[in-house]
Regions:
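Conserved glycine-rich beta-strand-loop-beta hairpin in the small C-terminal domain of fold type I
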Residues: 241-255, 267-282, 319
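Short beta-strand segments
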Residues: 68-71, 121-124, 153-156, 182, ...
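PLP-dependent enzyme catalytic core of the Aspartate aminotransferase-like
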Residues: 14-18, 22, 26, 31, ...
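Conserved core of the PLP fold type I
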Residues: 2-148, 153-175, 179, 350-355
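Conserved core segment of the aminotransferase class I/II
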Residues: 62-66, 82, 174-248, 260, ...
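Short, conserved charged micro-motifs
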Residues: 286-292, 333-337
Length: 355
C-alpha cells in the first residue's frame, strides 16, 4: 500500500534516510544522520538542483559557476544549468603509462578558484574515462574548496560505498563542506530513478524545499525496494561480491579484445579504474572522433565521440577530437563484435593518412 498510497516527505522516506545514514556510518565512518540525507528522483535531478543552487545568478547580482577541475567529464552535466556559461573547466595532465595506457590527473599547477566559483564538482569514478581520482587528489580538492568557502560535489553514481564499480584503491570521503551524490541505478534499479544526496543540513533543507516545489515529494518506489537490501545488510554485499567482480571480469575481456583489435596503431586506453567504460585515445587520428563516430554508426556500432565530454573552452586542443567512449556493459558477443569493427575503422582512418 505504501508504494502508491502515500506521499513521503519532501526530503524523502524517513526510514530509508535513517538506514542510509546508518550504512554510511558503519561502512565509511561518516558522522551523518537522517537529516544529512535527501532523496531525489535520480542523480540527474540531484545535480540539476545542486548546480542551480550554487551557480547562476545570485541575490548579490553575481554570476557564479561550477568549476570542473578535470575534464573530460560527464556529458549530462553540461545542460543542467538554467543559465549559459555555467561551467569553468580545466585540462588534465596526461601521464603515459607504458606503450598503450595513460591516465588523466588534476593539474593543480594551473587550477585556480576565482571569486565567481560557486562549487567544485568531480565524478569518482568518472564517466566517460573510468578514471578514479586518487585519495591525494581528492583531499587536495577538498582543502581547496574549504579555503575558498565553496562546497566540493562528488558524483558517486558508480562509486563508493555502493555500487562500488571501483577497481583501484580509493577511500570514500565526506565532510560538512562536501556533498556526495549516490544512486540506486547501478545496483540494478535504474528505472526507479532514486538519487541520494549526502550533505550538511543547510543543503539538504534546500533540496527538501526544491522537491516540495517541483514534485511535492520524491518517489517512494526506489527507497521501499532498496529498504529490503538495507534491512538484510545485503546492499554492500551485493556491490562487493556481485556487481564489482562482474564488471571487473567484463573489463578484462574488453581490454584484451581492444588490444588485439588495435595492435599496430598508435592507440592508448585510459587505465580503467572504475565504471563500465573504456576511453580510447587515438593520437594523431587523421579524421575527427565525430567522423569516426559516424562511420561506426553506419556499421551499427555505437560509441560516443570524446569531443562531447570536453566543454568548448574557446581554445583549440586536438586531444578533444581524438577520443572515443566505449561501453562494455552489453552482451560479451556484442562487445567483441563492436570492438572488432572499431579496430577495422581505426585502421582504415590511419591508412587514409598513410600512418
Amino acid at each position: 500500500e505504501h508504494f502508491i498510497g502515500h506521499y513521503d516527505g519532501p526530503q524523502g522516506n524517513l526510514l530509508f534516510r535513517q538506514s542510509i545514514a546508518e550504512l554510511l556510518k558503519k561502512e565509511c565512518g561518516w558522522p551523518v544522520e537522517a537529516n544529512n540525507i535527501a532523496v531525489t528522483n535520480g542523480s540527474q535531478e540531484s545535480f540539476f538542483i545542486l548546480f542551480n543552487l550554487f551557480a547562476g545568478e545570485h541575490d548579490d547580482n553575481q554570476f557564479r559557476r561550477i568549476l570542473l577541475p578535470l575534464t573530460p567529464e560527464y556529458i549530462g552535466y553540461f545542460d543542467a544549468g538554467l543559465g549559459q556559461d555555467l561551467f569553468r573547466t580545466y585540462r588534465p595532465k596526461i601521464e603515459h603509462l607504458g606503450p598503450h595506457r595513460f591516465k588523466y590527473r588534476v593539474d593543480f599547477d594551473s587550477l585556480t578558484v576565482t571569486g565567481d566559483v560557486g562549487a567544485l564538482c568531480v565524478s569518482r569514478p568518472t564517466n566517460p574515462t573510468g578514471n578514479v581520482l586518487t585519495d591525494t587528489e581528492l583531499e587536495q580538492l577538498r582543502r581547496l574548496a574549504a579555503e575558498h568557502n565553496v562546497p566540493l560535489l562528488i558524483d558517486g553514481a558508480y562509486g563508493l560505498p555502493f555500487p562500488n564499480i571501483v577497481f583501484s584503491q580509493a577511500t570514500p570521503m565526506w565532510d560538512d563542506n562536501t556533498i556526495v551524490c549516490l544512486s540506486l541505478s547501478k545496483i540494478g534499479l535504474p528505472g526507479v530513478r532514486t538519487g541520494i544526496v549526502v550533505a550538511n543540513t543547510q543543503v539538504t533543507q534546500a533540496i527538501r524545499g526544491t522537491n516540495a516545489i517541483l514534485n511535492l515529494a520524491p518517489s517512494s518506489f526506489g527507497p521501499l525496494l532498496a529498504q529490503q537490501l538495507l534491512n538484510s545488510g545485503q546492499l554492500i554485499d551485493l556491490a562487493e561480491n556481485n556487481i564489482q567482480p562482474y564488471y571487473r571480469s567484463r573489463l578484462e575481456q574488453a581490454m584484451h579484445w581492444l588490444d588485439i583489435a588495435l595492435e599496430g596503431t598508435p592507440y592508448r586506453i585510459h587505465v580503467a579504474e572504475g565504471a563500465f567504460f573504456l576511453w580510447l585515445w587515438l593520437e594523431g587520428l587523421p579524421v575527427s572522433s565525430d567522423v569516426l563516430y559516424q562511420r561506426l554508426k553506419a556499421r551499427d556500432t555505437l560509441v560516443i565521440s570524446g569531443s562531447h565530454f570536453f566543454p568548448d573552452s574557446g581554445t583549440s586542443w586536438p586531444h578533444r577530437h581524438e577520443c572515443l567512449r566505449i561501453s562494455y556493459a552489453q552482451a560479451p558477443d556484442q562487445v567483441e563484435q563492436g570492438i572488432r569493427i572499431i579496430g577495422e575503422e581505426v585502421r582504415s582512418a590511419y591508412a587514409e593518412d598513410g600512418t
